[in-house]
């Protein structure tokens, strides 16, 4: 989903009445995103909730995050797309990645499953993921990413990319997978598990944007 060079991210997960408005608004705010240190933006649309969107902004450094969250432009952007409640926001860095595709830098083409959660023992969680690589591969998982929150090492964003919706459904319906990897997703202030498809990618600075 995200190549290794995009190691610092700001992810927002929210519901809007019309998800098609999100991409044009992001494009119009390209200069503002560049000023805050963003170099790529990824947009995903949910396959289970027609009003749900996940946006990941890849950053050059950590420093702009607090500034971005406090900025008037950040709040105004959510108002513009119709967000009624401020969404869940995850800011963190890549700490673990696995690729089961020939070209790990290729744009995502399948289904992404994203869970934001708190784990009791982050190093143990990472070790368990490493030990389960064969299971991921057999299940049709194409990429795995683990991001650690800047302000809490126990808070992680756990991302899988699978080849299609059928593979994703089989993966999520496995009792062992649901219990071990996603049981804490959606608990407390964290959003429910996000299941969606890549829609758009913007490269900040070169004027290019792509979409499905």
Question: Where in the sequence are the language-model features?
Answer:
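Short S/T/G/P-rich N-terminal loop/turn motif that feeds into the first structured element of a domain
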Residues: 1-212
